[in-house]
Every structure is written in C-alpha cells, then in structure tokens.
Amino acid sequence: MRIADYSVTKAVLERHGFTFKKSFGQNFLTDTNILQKIVDTAEIDDQVNVIEIGPGIGALTEFLAERAAQVMAFEIDHRLVPILVDTLRDFDNVTVVNEDILKVDLAQHIQNFKNPNLPIKVVANLPYYITTPILMHLIESGIPFCEFVVMMQKEVADRISAQPNTKAYGSLSIAVQYYMTAKVAFIVPRTVFVPAPNVDSAILKMVRRPEPAVAVEDENFFFKVSKASFTHRRKTLWNNLTGYFGKTEEVKDKLTKALDQAGLSPSVRGEALSLAEFAGLADALKGQGL
C-alpha cells in the first residue's frame, strides 16, 4: 500500500485529526500512477538530490525517496510535520524542513545534503495560490537547479510554456523561458485530489539552459520592458510603451528611434514578439537612455 492510496490517505488524515486549510492551498494527490509518472518524467536516480515544496502527507515524497540520493521537503504547515515523520519513518534520506520556501536561506539548507555537489532537481505539487512567486524565487535564486518538474494549475503551465502569437503568451512566458526550456508533460485531472480543486492541473517540465536564451545588456530592464509590453494585451506596443515610459515628445522621439533600430512596427502587439525581439527592443530602448 502507498501513502497516496485513497484508503491510506484517509486513514492517515483521520488518525492525526487533520483538517485542510484553504489558506495553504492544500490538495493531496491520491493516484499512484500519476505519482510514478511524475518521478519518471523527472528522471530521478541516486545521483540526484531533490527539493520538494509542499509535501503534504508524503505521497510524492515516498516515490522520490525510493530513487533519489536525498530529498529535502519544505512544508509551511507545522501540523503536517508529525504526519510526515510518521508516514516517511522508513526512509533515512528525507529531511523535512518546516519553513516557508520564500523566506528560507535555501543555499544554506542545500549545504546540508550529504553530497551537496550532486545535481539538484525541484519536484513538487505547488500550491496554486503561490505558484508563480515560488517558481520565480527559485529560478532567480542563483542556485543552479538543473530541472523543475512541477504540478500547477493547467492555465499557469500553459502560460509559462506558451509561444509567441498565442493567447497564453505573456511576460510570465518570457520570464521563465529566458532561463529555462518549458514543456507541459501531461495533464492531471482534478478528480484525483482530496479535496478536489476547481480546475485541472498540469505537470510542467523545465530544464535550465546552459546560458540565458538571449543576450541582453540589462536583465532587469529587459524584464521591465517585456512586462510593460503586455500591460494591456489588446493595445499596440507603442501604446503600452508610452504608457510605461511617458508621452512627452522627447520620449516619443526616443521610442520611435528604438523601435526603428529594433526593426519593429509601432502597431505590433507584444504577443507577437519573440524573446530575441524583446531583447533587441530592450537594448535599443536602453541605448536611447530610456
């Protein structure tokens, strides 16, 4: 029997008198086939350390611990810690950290792996309400995670992996794809969770690029420009950029020159631009002193 078997999950929750907290976005997976598929997608073996976020009662952790060198699971809900100690008692390669992943000194914790030099993968069922902040925090942390295999709301997975000229493409697509390749591995129906969420989920596989997807003079400025370009999706690049930089004649003149230098029409919409085109635009705007 597995932790994720519905009867086991139910028994564990009843034994510990656990009640779900909406504020933590708790939905526990009760399908062992999907858990197996997640671990297979992540290609976990004993030469990999794993960071898990939101382990719940240990359903995914159990599958990870069977294969990985070590698993470090960050759980914000202190009520789940004794449950995890109980359900994972047979594993000596799991460390449960009762901390908020957004506030911990992750680099320091990683030094506590027995072999901190092994590649580190992030494998997790992320809370829907805070998926994007967690992902961007980890991606921008400077810690060289080689791969993420994470479950999230399908809509968010579609946005992250979207390509130009699609409805889902936006500043989040650019922010993630600058650092990583991103592809939806498979869909997870809402029916396999306790309690069932209101939407379906997706497993997103992201692999870190050896170098960022494009070269830019100023990364922060590049992200600001891409975000500004999607402020109002139905508006043109010109309208969004003047809304961000200002509408003085001096600014308009600089914008005109930058767009011309980048080879872009003022009437194009942000959703039509590739990462390379956003890089060219950001550098041209920077060159104009904006």
UniProtKB/Swiss-Prot annotation:
It catalyses: adenosine(1518)/adenosine(1519) in 16S rRNA + 4 S-adenosyl-L-methionine = N(6)-dimethyladenosine(1518)/N(6)-dimethyladenosine(1519) in 16S rRNA + 4 S-adenosyl-L-homocysteine + 4 H(+). GO terms for cellular component: cytosol. CDD domains: AdoMet_MTases. Keywords: Cytoplasm, Methyltransferase, RNA-binding, rRNA processing, S-adenosyl-L-methionine, Transferase. Its main location: cytoplasm. Transmembrane segments: none annotated. Its EC number is 2.1.1.182. It is found in: Cytoplasm. The keyword Electron transport does not apply. GO terms for molecular function: 16S rRNA (adenine(1518)-N(6)/adenine(1519)-N(6))-dimethyltransferase activity; RNA binding. It comes from the Bacteria. Disulfide bonds: none annotated. InterPro entries: KsgA/Erm, rRNA_Ade_diMease-like_C, rRNA_Ade_Mease_Trfase_CS, rRNA_Ade_methylase_Trfase_N, rRNA_adenine_dimethylase, SAM-dependent_MTases_sf. S-adenosyl-L-methionine binds at residues 27, 29, 54, 75, 100, 125. Belongs to the class I-like SAM-binding methyltransferase superfamily. rRNA adenine N(6)-methyltransferase family. RsmA subfamily. Specifically dimethylates two adjacent adenosines (A1518 and A1519) in the loop of a conserved hairpin near the 3'-end of 16S rRNA in the 30S particle. May play a critical role in biogenesis of 30S subunits. This is Ribosomal RNA small subunit methyltransferase A.
